[in-house]
Structure formats: C-alpha cells, structure tokens
Amino acid sequence: NRHFDEDNLLNWVATNILMDNMDTDANNFFIYSPLNNNKWLILPWDYDDGWDSGRSQDFIRPYQAGISTYWGNRLLNRYFRIQENVDKLTAKLEDLHEKYINEQTVTTQLDKYASFVEQYVQKYPDNQYLPIIGINYQSEIQSIISTPIRALERYYEDLEKPKPFFQHNKAVLEDGQHIFAWDVSFDLQGDDLYYDVTIARDPAMQQVIYQQVDLRLNEVRVSQLEQGTYYMKVTVKDSVGNTQTSFDMIKDSDTGEY
C-alpha cells in the first residue's frame, strides 16, 4: 500500500482474469501516478486478446490461467506468495463476477450492438480479415458470453497447481559435467514439488539423451556433451498430482512452437 493502490491492483488483475485477457503479464498496461496521489495506479490497455480470442493464438502457453499468468511479473509474484493476498484476489473475482462481469451482464451489452455489427463483418474489408464470418459469428458471441465463468473455473483450477518457472538458457560445464538448471517453482498450498526433466537434440524431444522424473533438486548433471545445441523440457508436479509447465518456449521455423 505504500507505493501501489491495492484495490486498483486487485481490480486490474481480477478484471483481466474474468475477461481472459492473458497478454497482460508484462505489457499492455500503463503505470500512472496522478499529481494528487503519491501512489501508482495501473491503467488497462489493449484487450484484443481477451474474451477467449487469445486462446486460439499459438503464443499462448498452457500455464496462462489465473495467477500463473502473472507469475513472471516480479511485483505480482511477490504479492501472491502471501496467502492473504490470494484470498483478497479470490474475493475480488467473486465480487466482480457476481455484480459486473458475468453471463447476464455480458449478454446485455452484446444485445445492444451484436446484430448491428453482424452485417459489417460479412462485408469487405472485414470479411477478408476477421475469422468470425458466416455461421461462426453466433458461436463467437456465445464464446464471449461464457468467457467469465470459464475464466473463473480456470482460476480455481490454477490455485491448486504449482507455479511456472524459468529454465536456464545455458548449461554450465563444471568438473567434466554439464549442469542443466531451472528456477524453483512455488506451490500456494505448500505441497512438495517434483520435477520431470528431458534433454534432447531436437525441440520435439524425440532424440532424447537424458531423462529423469520425480527430482527434488532444480538441476541435473550429465557427462560432458559434444558441442552443439540441446533442448530441455522441465515440468513440475505437486504431491497430489497437479502439474505445471515452465515459462519457456521455442519457435522453430520449420516445425512450429514448443
């Protein structure tokens, strides 16, 4: 509360979650301090990947739901490590969903202009660039209407999962061994965490050179490898079986994203 307005912060996170606006973890917002206020406020900006539309994009990762979406944000990472703050967000989400962002309120807003807009998305130039022409239009409308409740369900599911983490980009050579490492995950319930790691010569992880499961440490050591490019995939699971991926991805121009 010294530097940020907590209610503003919670409203911003909760609104983005309910509207499924995932591309807000480290961008697409302004930080603003008005002249008559000594605290910083977060102003929303850019919702073009919200309302379920972003989930069809290839840059959206499996971890992007609920609090995990913001785990790479240092401020929110520190804030949500405290259970009291998680409880505040849950209360804020439930309040906003009950009063403002739900199936009924979204339907009311869509009813004001959905039929008017439909005639234009069928015509040039929109019909050349929008993926919601023809029979898809009504299904898109229904997807928007159901976004808040599905987002809230994903939020509850994400609370049980370990949080995503970063893998280290370089393998350190030490005493004739290459060390492959990653950051430690975090579990909101304090469950024990176990890592599964695979190292391969290809991004599809088909040419495997090392594999181990149920590791408690956040590194593995393998005998010195030949010079070249190697790929590592690490996942984490808690003691009751909830799993999570790392933040990392790689885009291969020939075979796609991993």
Regions found by a protein language model. Give the residues of each.
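Extracellular fibronectin type III
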Residues: V240-Y258
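An aromatic-rich alpha-helical recognition segment common to small helix-rich domains
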Residues: W182, V197, V222, M232-V234
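Solvent-exposed loop/turn segments flanking beta-strands in beta-repeat/beta-sandwich domains
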Residues: S185-Q206, T243
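Middle-to-C-terminal accessory/interaction subdomains
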Residues: N1-D25, Y32-D187, D192
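Beta-strand-rich modules
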Residues: Q224-T243
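Residue-level signal for short segments within beta-strands and strand-turn junctions
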Residues: S33, I199-P203, V236-D238
